[in-house]
Amino acid sequence: MVAAFKWSISDWHELVDSGVLAQHRVELLEGEIIEMSPEGPMHSSTNHSVVEYFRELLGKRAVIREAHAITLDNSEPEPDIAVVRSPYNDYFSRHPYAKDIYWLVEISNKTLKLDLERKLATYARNGIIEYWVIDLVNKKLVVHTQPVGNSYTQIQNLTTGNISPQAFPDLAIRVDRMLLF
């Protein structure tokens, strides 16, 4: 049996710091280097729109990170949007850990299978309390909460109405405002 080499977080950081990966869109997921798909116009426009909307709603209550790494056990994915604890200067010397994350958002078109399977399992296993997938293919928001093991026990498929993140129950986020396509 042949086993794939698994990268540790420290080895991954050395590789990133060396510059070898500078021309590649990759991330570390469960010790494996995963090549990411290029973003199309729908993906990037949705990302920009949702980030601006979140910043309007949250102000300084949280930091909104766009496609920047987070550090989990044996993984350093770059979710499209990470809503993390303030202040921003906490992340000058490290990426946010699971304990810093309010919720994550992936915008999925070509990566829907990866986002709803492998990334979901990684996020759940690391205790990410809330994980949203903006499904560009099926025009819906899929909200995952209550992580247990490799999955989430609560899943909502939304196309209209409001959603309140667990970390901000007073916040009413319009689903249709995120699904502008």
Q: For each predicted feature, which ranges?
A:
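Gly/Pro/Ser/Thr-rich low-complexity, intrinsically disordered segments predominantly at protein N-termini
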Residues: 1-181
